[in-house]
């Protein structure tokens, strides 16, 4: 059995889909479906069982055996970069992850988890998986950074696989439940379909991020499970592209619309990453050599998925 925490969420459900595509259906999804809309991410997927996150955590903390576990993909977390409740964030992202890590270590179960490029904070170069480059800007980034630091202490002694992925700007199918935290491509598509002008912040041609397609993210997760490699790795494309490029690809797909530029909000000044670009040296050195979709390729595929019933 493979366990996917956050399996009804964005990246988790895409990992479930990638496992299904390989013929794997003996999957336990762990999630919190208080937001009932997330169920839509699972309706076309095949899983063996579902468990609520709180019930799962109780079983983990009590040391209860959950059966023959082949691996745990730990994608369950609070991923809101605008959430400032530090206790909630540390409980959800740090303590929960530690409990799960030790459960896996004691049983030598491969543990593959979601870290984040938010660990790098506001830097504009050298996104390298090393302490001197890490300075998160928000409590979300700090919770991810602290767990990475915890993992670094354990890795040299670990007898089983531990691998963390620093996700950059992930976009693609099954993110509709994320609301304001969904990708720019998702929001632009929604605005166009509602007959509105798609909106970008002024200066969006200068705001560049490493936008990585979720299908590529899932593929990297599965490759690492098969390879058995451990470590903390950036997971982006290695190419920074502008928000304008995302908009251009969206408009090209729809063949209509023009961008409306809106003022940059004061509340985001100083807390907004203007540039991100994954350094893929460690990922490539680990042996992952497949190409990543460009924004034009990924957004076009995503638009086709979003508008498949149109």
Swiss-Prot record:
Protein residues bound to substrate: 169, 180, 187, 201-204, 209, 272
Pfam families documented for this protein: Epimerase
InterPro entries: Epimerase_deHydtase, Heptose_epim, NAD(P)-bd_dom_sf
Protein name stated in the entry: ADP-L-glycero-D-manno-heptose-6-epimerase
UniProt subunit comment: Homopentamer.
Cofactor note: Binds 1 NADP(+) per subunit.
Cofactor: NADP(+)
Family: Belongs to the NAD(P)-dependent epimerase/dehydratase family. HldD subfamily.
MF term (GO), any: ADP-glyceromanno-heptose 6-epimerase activity
Chain sites annotated for binding NADP(+): 10-11, 31-32, 38, 53, 75-79, 92, 144, 170, 178
